[in-house]
Each structure stands twice: as structure tokens, then as C-alpha cells.
Amino acid sequence: MASRLVRRCTCLLREAARLAPAMSPVGQPRLTRGAPRTLTSSATSPSSHLPGSLSELVERGQVFTPYPERQEVDHLIERATQPEEILALLGGGHCLHQNRAALMVIQLSRLLSEKPKDKALLIKDARFQHLLRLVNSQINAVWHGTLVKLLRSLYALGLPATSKELQSVEQEVRWRMRRLRYKHLAFLAESSATYMQEQGSQELLAELLVHLERRWTEIDDGRTVVAMMVKIGHLSQSLMNRLEDKCLELVEQFGPEELRKVLVMLAAQNRRSVPLLRAVSYHLVQKPFTLTKSILLDLAYAYGKLGFHQTQVFQRLAADLLPHTPSLTSSEVARCTKSFAFLKWLSLPLFEAFAQHVLDRAQSIALPHLCNMLLAFARVNFRPEREDQFFSLVHEKLGSQLAGLEPALQVDVVWSLCVLQQAREAELQAVLRPELHGQFLGDKSPKDQSTFQKLLHINATAQLEHPEYTGPHLPSSALVPRPSALDKKVTPLQKELQETLKGLLGSADKGSFLVATRYGWILDAEVLLDADSQLLPLRDFVAPHLAQPSGSQPLPAGAKRLAFLCWEFPNFNSRSKDLLGRFVLARRHLLAAGFLLVDVPYYEWLELKSEWQKSAYLKDKMRKAAAEELAK
């Protein structure tokens, strides 16, 4: 049996060698579209013993279709620089086999990629219509790679969805979907998904996404997975999950450009994939990449948009950006400052460089960029070393242009100046006038409610920190806390504080919890002490910090109001015990309103394990607050 098999294989090889000259010089045989024919050794097949059996088989239906030899027409198609050169080939007596006609359409699409008017004229050209019919008649013989490029080209040329030729190509792609290589599917998805949505080819797009998801394990390079995540990941949640898995598998191969694209894509889709963000962050820290200015800016934006905190990455971004600050534009500086403020990452050298950038370009910096930087500085409570010069420039710019800003932006800017203790009377008057604050008095969108909350803080700043300010103010009705002000979920720290404090007070009328003040701030707890530090019933005495009076008796001489404030982890700058600007403003207002403050930061409370320790901690805090007041 073995000898017979060897003789038969030798015969077949000899026949194949005889046919070799008919094949392409490339020497890469290609299977035909038809069903493959298998060469077998069967005793029941007498014809297989004949030496000419292979040639007969080739004559009946070739097993391999060789690539045709390149001819002059192929070079003419490739070198064409005008559509007319392509169309002229139709009447030149050239042999346009199944692939050449499709290649002509592809080349026409390339030449007219940025000429929409010429595309419309081309579609009406009779020669182009003839070319489309020629392609349609040979569509089943067009090679796979050419087929997907052909479909992309027809979309790009703007053929109507009702075009018979376009529908024919789409149908051919659907028939071949299982046999197309993954790179062909990926190319089609990257280049044509948008066209498919616009053309109404939803069925083809859906089928394409299904095949991409089923065969996701065939992806073997980082470029493909990154491109697909960027271009089509948002179209299918399940496909995006698979692509993220593959990205995690290949992320070690990524360079800085691929890492940038992944992060920007996640930020654009607001997709906070923690495992992927951790993997990308690890490689950014561990690998000695050279990060360009544009990559650094995009990374800062992406991390800021996603709110993903990674200390070592932020340290590297800040250190690498610092040498680039002289070459940054005002727009880039504002964008970068905003990104770091979202991350609550205060790098003093970098922020000082940003402030110096503003001073160096005092005459040319645009007001919107200056406003963005002011809001960022207020968020992290940053005041430059040259603050007099910096804020003089801010006031100079705002003096003539503040009224021209959007009402909400006017409020944001003046609120930021209040946080940084730089607000002037004219700026307070500009946002507290009825014509402006009246737009935000009703219960509207969350954004409007946030703006109104800032108006309360601005009004409190005018009352408590600017004794010379004469008005206008918000109306008394606007100072009444809204029901939504106390709707927030109680945190574990607040709950434990309330329980511990209730045990210390002994009586419910000796303290209040979650007190909404007329200044726009909420106290976690409030107690009243007499001159001997004994608890007094709150509801019996006047409370000027409340919008609605609760008692009639004046405070006894030497009485003190204590406000308990819980400071959670998000209230602080990243990796710092410094409060964000918003909460620094709250402390200032409450101190100016006559309160003694009992600060309860999370990092101190977490160290207390027993109820006894928590009670002793609060007693000690209350004694210290009273003692500091007496020492003044």
C-alpha cells in the first residue's frame, strides 16, 4: 500500500510540475470560489490510475486559480491621476478581467476622495455606469480583499442605497462573510461602518458586528484591536467587551500612540474600564516611553474625563509637561489645567508655570481660556505666588467682558473669585442683580440647581466677607432650603457621627443633624453651649443662620454654636489633607457666621475602633474648639 501511495503521489507531482508555467510568477495559488475538489486515492476510481487524470480534472474545473500576470493596463490603473484616465480605459480595447474593473472603481474613489462635486458628476457619467455593470456581471469572481475595498469605494462615491450594483456588492459580501479573513472584516468595519449607518444597510452592519464578535480571538495585532475599539466599539456593547479583553491581552505590545488612542477612546465613550485603565497606567509608568507634548495633553484629558486616579502616572505627566509649558498655547494650558483640576491633582511647580504662562501672554490670552484656568485654580484652591499680578489681570479682563459671558459662566467665574478671596463689589453686583439670578430660581435642571447653589455662596460671601457691600442680594424667599438639598444619601461617616453624638447629648433637643443654612451649606450636626460649656436646647434660641426662624430667645452671654463638619475622601485634593476650594469656602463662611467648627476628617475617624474612642474624640474636639475661641 505504501509503495502504491508513493507512486501515485509522484505521478501527481510530475503533473503539477508540468502545469507550473501556466501559473503566476508569484507562485501563490488561490482557491476558486467554487466548492473545492479533493484529490483522493480510491480503489473504486479507476480513472485515478491514469497518468492524465490530473489534467482531466483541471480541464473540468481547476483546483487552483493562479493570479493573472500583470499587464500594462494594471500599471495604467495604478498610475492614473485623473478620473478621465481611468474611464478612458473602458474603450481602449484592454482586457478587463473580474478584478481590474473593481480596481478601476477603487482608484476612482481615491482620486475623488475630497471632491464631492466631481463624485456627483461621475455617478451620472455613462462610462461609469457601464463600469458598474461590468463589475456587477463579474462580482462572484472578485477577490476577497478587492471586494471589501470595492464596497468601501462605492459607499465613498455616494451611490444611492437603491443602486442595483451597490446592493449586489453588499449581498456578495454577506455571502462570503464566513470565508473572509478577519483583517478583511476589520477593514470593512473600520472604513464603512459609518457609511452603512447612513445608507441604511443595518442588516449588513449587524451581521458584520456579529462575525467580528464571534471571531475576536483571531485578532493578533494591537493596531487592529485599537482601530476597532475607536471606530466601531461603540456600536456593540458585547463586541466592545471582547475587544477590551483582547486589548488587555495585547497591551504589552502597545507603544505610546496606541496607549493614547485607547485612553482617548475610553474618555470619548465615557467608558471607565478599570482593568484596562490599570493595565495602561502600569505600562505608562514602567516603560521608558518618550511622550510627546500632544500625547501628554491627551493622557491628562483622558484621565481627567474618566476620573481615574493613578498617582505615579500623574507624577510623570506633571514632570514631563513642565518643560513643555513655554511652547504650549493658551488653549492647551487651559485644557491641561482643567484636566488636572478634575483629577484634584495639585502640582505646585506645574500650576505656577501655568500662572506664569498667563502673565507672559497677558495681552493675547482669550477670556474663555482665562475663565477655565480660574475655575481650575478655585477647584484645587491654588493661589499663585504672584497672585497680585495674576488677579489684577483677571479683574482687568473681566471688567469690560464679564457681562458678555453666558449667565451660568458669569456665576462660575465670580464664585471662583469668592473661593480664592478675590471677588470685588462690582463683580458681586453683576451676578446678584435680579435680571441674572432670576433665571435660576425655579427648580430646573441639575445644572441650573448647581448654579443657584453657587449664587447662594456668592450671596453669603457678600454678606459675611464684604461688610461694605450694599446690594443687591438674593431675595429672602430664595434662601429657604429646597427639599432636594437634604435628599442626599447619608454616608457611613455621617451616620456614625450622628449615632455617637446622640449618645453624648442624651436629649434630642440638645442637637440638630443635617442642618441646611441660608448660606447654601449643610451642617452635619449643630449644638449650642453656654459659657460653662453646658449643652443648651437649640430650638429655644434665635438662629440667624436659618432662613426660617425657630426660636425667640436671644443667646445667653458667652454662648457658643458648634458646627460639626464631616470631611470625606472626595473633599480633599488627591494624596493630600488639603480641602478642595469649595470646602475651604464653606469653613470660611461658617466661621464668619459665628460658628465654632468641629472638623471630622475621614482619615482621623477611621482610626477610631470603639464607641468609647469615638465619644472621647468628639469630646476632645469640642473642648479644643471652645478653648481656641477663649484664647482669641
Swiss-Prot record:
Q: Disordered: where is this region?
A: 24-53
Cellular compartment(s):
Mitochondrion matrix
The answer to whether UniProt assigns keyword Transit peptide to this entry is: yes
What InterPro entries does this protein map onto? FAST_2, FAST_kinase, FAST_Leu-rich, RAP
The principal localisation class reads mitochondrion
Give the transit peptide, as a residue range. Answer: 1-112
Q: Which GO terms describe its biological process?
A: mitochondrial mRNA processing; mitochondrial RNA processing; mRNA metabolic process; regulation of mitochondrial mRNA stability
What does the UniProt record say this protein does? Plays a role in processing of mitochondrial RNA precursors and in stabilization of a subset of mature mitochondrial RNA species, such as MT-CO1, MT-CO2, MT-CYB, MT-CO3, MT-ND3, MT-ND5 and MT-ATP8/6. May play a role in cell cycle progression.
Protein name per Swiss-Prot or TrEMBL: FAST kinase domain-containing protein 4
What is the protein's species of origin? Sus scrofa (Pig)
